[in-house]
């Protein structure tokens, strides 16, 4: 029997553009079902890693559903698609009164966060309850940054480099932290359950918008051999046709670089640049190693679809169109991925997640 591979899923940050990786995963799920294999994503992937919106997706697929059946995840891919296409409008919305108030006391979104985090927090509590990351149905890594201790934080249910158990966090708070994009939401105050202390965390996208290399390193910490690891990295789209013109940028000053109306250019450049760099590094690193399989799926999106917070119906149509093109352009590769996944599921002998491949969701 072939040795079981370790499939690792990594998803970038990108706000409402998280709809794109959800659609790609739906395509994989549909292809599996067409081949007679029906399993939840936490059985397909041995480790999931996400930043920001990617953290929300991976956590929802890996967390146990409060009050659900054994092995039932907090959300299905269909649930997540509904969130992006319908519920995200509540997260990224403001009442007329609040918009008028902000125009007076917070022009250009420079002196306070753009959105009230309470609707997001209510949704997260409803979806995750008070379960903690220690109860995850598969290995999981979420990125964040501690603004008080000035350090990168990798929230995981795996192992530290010294072999000890990682710090534990409530799922809903961990997701609130990894999605706390500066200028969009306030920093998250979360409880470190292991250390019995609070931490002030913000979106991991400030240092690692594409967490593929972090996902690989976590896999190695777990003792997995490099030749057994397959990394599937999903992007949230790239807008090559949305430049920041020199003639405008030279007059922005410190406040202009953070203007919400311009899509927060500084954060946009940081996130896009880091994702491109991480993808470049991963592709060449894994190619040079010649042992770990690395697969990156991403694509171009229209300039007007780049905003992290544009949940209007017209923009969702653009994002769905971009996802359709990525899926269409990578049909052969997606079929190859599904072939590998099915072969791997059939070679699963003795895994704690093993069981029937049909109607296992």
Give the positions of each predicted feature.
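Conserved catalytic cores and adjacent C-terminal regulatory segments
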Residues: 1-361
């Amino acid at each position: 029997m072939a040795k079981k591979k370790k499939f690792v899923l990594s998803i970038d940050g990108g706000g409402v553009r998280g709809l794109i990786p959800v659609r790609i995963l739906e395509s994989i799920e549909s292809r599996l079902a067409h081949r007679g294999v029906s399993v939840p994503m936490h059985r397909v992937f041995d480790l999931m890693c996400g930043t920001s919106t990617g953290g929300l997706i991976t956590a929802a697929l890996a967390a146990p559903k409060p009050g659900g059946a054994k092995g039932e995840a907090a959300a299905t891919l269909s649930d997540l698609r509904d969130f992006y296409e319908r519920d995200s409008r509540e997260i990224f919305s403001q009442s007329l009164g609040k918009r008028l108030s902000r125009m007076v006391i917070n022009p250009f979104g420079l002196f306070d966060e753009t959105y009230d985090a309470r609707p997001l927090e209510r949704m997260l509590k409803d979806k995750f309850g008070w379960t903690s990351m220690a109860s995850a149905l598969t290995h999981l890594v979420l990125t964040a940054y501690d603004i008080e201790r000035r350090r990168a934080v990798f929230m995981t249910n795996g192992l530290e480099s010294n072999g000890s158990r990682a710090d534990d966090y409530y799922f809903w708070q961990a997701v609130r932290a990894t999605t706390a994009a500066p200028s969009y939401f306030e920093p998250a105050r979360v409880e470190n359950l292991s250390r019995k202390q609070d931490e002030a965390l913000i979106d991991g996208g400030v240092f690692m918008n594409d967490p593929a290399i972090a996902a690989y390193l976590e896999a190695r910490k777990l003792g997995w051999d490099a030749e057994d690891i397959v990394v599937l990295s999903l992007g949230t789209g790239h807008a090559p046709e949305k430049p920041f013109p020199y003639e405008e940028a030279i007059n922005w000053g410190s406040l202009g670089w953070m203007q919400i109306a311009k899509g927060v250019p500084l954060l946009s450049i940081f996130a896009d640049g880091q994702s491109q760099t991480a993808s470049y590094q991963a592709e060449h690193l894994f190619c040079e190693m010649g042992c770990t399989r690395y697969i990156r799926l991403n694509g171009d999106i229209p300039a007007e679809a780049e905003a992290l917070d544009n949940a209007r119906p017209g923009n969702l149509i653009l994002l769905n169109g971009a996802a359709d093109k990525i899926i269409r352009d990578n049909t052969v590769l997606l079929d190859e991925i599904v072939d590998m996944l099915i072969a791997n599921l059939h070679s699963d002998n003795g895994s704690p997640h093993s069981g029937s491949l049909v109607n296992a969701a």
